[in-house]
Swiss-Prot record:
Gene3D superfamilies with a match to the protein in the record: P-loop containing nucleotide triphosphate hydrolases
The organism's taxonomic lineage, starting at the top: Viruses, Duplodnaviria, Heunggongvirae, Peploviricota, Herviviricetes
Organism for this UniProt entry: Human herpesvirus 6B (strain Z29)
Protein name: DNA replication helicase
Pfam families referenced in this protein's UniProt entry, alphabetically: Herpes_Helicase
InterPro entries assigned: DNA_helicase_dom, HSV_HELI, P-loop_NTPase
Keywords for this protein: ATP-binding, DNA replication, Helicase, Host nucleus, Hydrolase, Nucleotide-binding
Similarity-based family: Belongs to the herpesviridae helicase family.
Amino acid sequence: MSISSLFGGRYDNKFLLNMSSAPKIELIVDKVASLSERRLEGRLPEDWFRHIMDPETEFNGEFADALCIGIDEFAQPLPFLPFKALLVTGTAGAGKTNSIQTLAANLDCIVTATTSIAAQNLSVVLNRSKSAQVKTIFKTFGFNSSHVSMSERQSYIANDERSIQIQQKQDLSIYWNVISDIAERALGAVACKTKELPDLCESSVIVIDEAGVILRHILHTVVFFYWFYNALYKTPLYENGIVPCIVCVGSPTQSNALVTSFNPLTQNKDVKRGIDVLSALICDDVLSKYCEVDNNWIIFVNNKRCADHAFGDFLKHIEFGLPLKPELIEYVDQFVKPASYIRNPMNEIETTRLFLSHNEVKNYFRSLHEQVEVTNRNNLFVFPVYFLIKNKTFEDYKSEIGNFSLEIEPWFKSNIHRLNTYSQFADQDLSKTVQLEEIVLEDGSVEETLITCHLKHIRNSSIGVTSKIKASTVGFSGTYEKFVELLQSDLFIEKTSCEQTIHAYSFLSGLMFGGMYSFCCSEFTTPEVLMEIKNIKMPSIEFLESEMSRMSRDVQTVETDERYDFGLVDDGLSDMDLLEIDPCGDPFFTRYSKLPLTNSLSFEEISLLYTTFKDIFISRFAILQKHTKGKFGKTLLVTYNRNNVSRKQCGEIYSHLKSFYGMLTYAIPANNYTLEGYTNDNVVHLGTDKQLPQILYKKGLPRLVIKDEMGFISVLDNNVSKFVDVVNGQSFHLCTTVDYATVSKVSMTITKSQGLSIQKVAIDFGSDPKNLKLSSIYVGMSRVTDPNNLIMNVNPLRLNYENDNFIAPHIVKALKNENTMLIF
């Protein structure tokens, strides 16, 4: 019997599971509140934070690369910095995010995440305004791009002592290159009184989402900076000795935390598995005992992302390390389809492909693009990606690493994964050939080398952004029914931060103004419909009617799929005359001739404009719906803000005014987008803060046009990022990348999919996987929201795989512990 059958099918399983767990989730608040009340038994040494000895020198007296904070001669050993921790783990999709929502709603806490995608996802879930976006834990404690190339180091311990005090210093020593740099900058900033109060001074409760993908030393790093910043700014938290409570949320049985190192001399990178924060808290006896994990562990049990009972039972067996009975292995057989079927891009077009390796993802994209190029060339976009190499800096870099024979092209090919988001270049169909050319200045000097590659994307494919990117929302594409629903529900307004409300009202008014003509030009429009439209009340709006300027009647275009004409009628004609002479003439534009821009109107005027247009638009919609028995609402509405817009067959979208005017917003990694096309036109508000060489614009630098899940169309700003390498303590700004910060969601690695909910999933484990791990099987299969939409090329449980779930015995032990809080 299913859960919902007990309630006569009135509620779905997902709703019932969430509601049944709600009371216990609320108990988490009490638990955290209790832990956050702990205080220091004594005080830390006076001014301990101003001059700190490198922890490594306490373990290794011969350590030559010591980095002290402050003045070396005044440096003192770092005192132990106490903390409390709460562990929140559970199966994929079990509702761990609900606990974060509850904490954020009931306690003054600092909510963070380990990755940009997780942080942006939390911002959406918590409905944070632009000024209160959730940050990564790295950004919260002061990490910036200059620290990316600072290598972690090995810590040396001469004896077997494993106290929490020694362990903390050892973990801090591993990350000390970064810690000391951030601390030195903070000391300088507070001396100049140029820095705002850091986030870690706001509360003693620090929530870290997806804590299973960061290395264990980050836990002690967060503790260090909590005490450091609060001591530096003499906050009430420090004066009262409030001990921080770190709430670590995530799943230790999913993707592993990785340690990556790069050798500048050989230009080789090394990647190996490390111990993540969650695994350390659970398995490390010293850390677990200090944090009293036996009493401070909360486990979510049921998968609420996919409420299918049999599938949920299967996932729990993997999560908790239970023996996989033959019937469970047989259960997985139903998802198997031939590899050739899954690898053919023409099959299961709306399904996301998941692979084990980046190479497999890249090969799939190449196969897909080859098919599209043959079947419909206009749907395949090829965009340039530029890399500007600073020649003088590159020569200095070669001297520093002692590799004088190193050339730009081989360096570029070895480092492309470091120049920007790894998956953007490792996964995508980036051209194998690169074009190098020197940028010659007017005086004949050559300061930079330009490298050009090309990236392929498919029109109307699902894409995401790799970081938070500035965008301008300029239009809407969807059904009339959907647009009217958005207007009536005020959903777009509610999702807009308070400081942007006036722009949201103005933008929607611009969309309605642009789409109003379509009611008179619809294939469903009849003389009777026009007569009813004419009778809709259109109140006088003085600031509109005083605008005497007229819009151009028509603009000739080339090779276009669509065309919009807001041509105005002669003032001497009555509405009835208009209807008799021109069936498509629109009385709306005789009343409201031109729409002013936002900055020329007050909030009250824009509110009046929005309300008036909304009433007229919905009235027109109701008339067409009545006459077509609901068919009209299913037809397509494409409208742009205060603009005539056309689309070429090649996918270029252009404005008849040569410029787009929209509402400034941001595209975020947590959202899904559809690639509509690209534009070369000017976009107001975008690109004004970027100083790029003119040669890039001459060669071509389009902006991508995307559509979100609600149907709103935006133009993405180009992404400009700097690559700074650090060698022997010296920083080298070697390269500036100009690209689009986009990545296709048509296919990705299983590791990258962690944390995502995907409607339809096809997993290709390869023909003969050599390094198949149980964690990869678990992550891949648990992404789907409905097992009926899951297919795989093999049953991975019938293959040889590594059971890397070493944490399972600890989880089973916790399940039997009466002090563990279980949330079903």
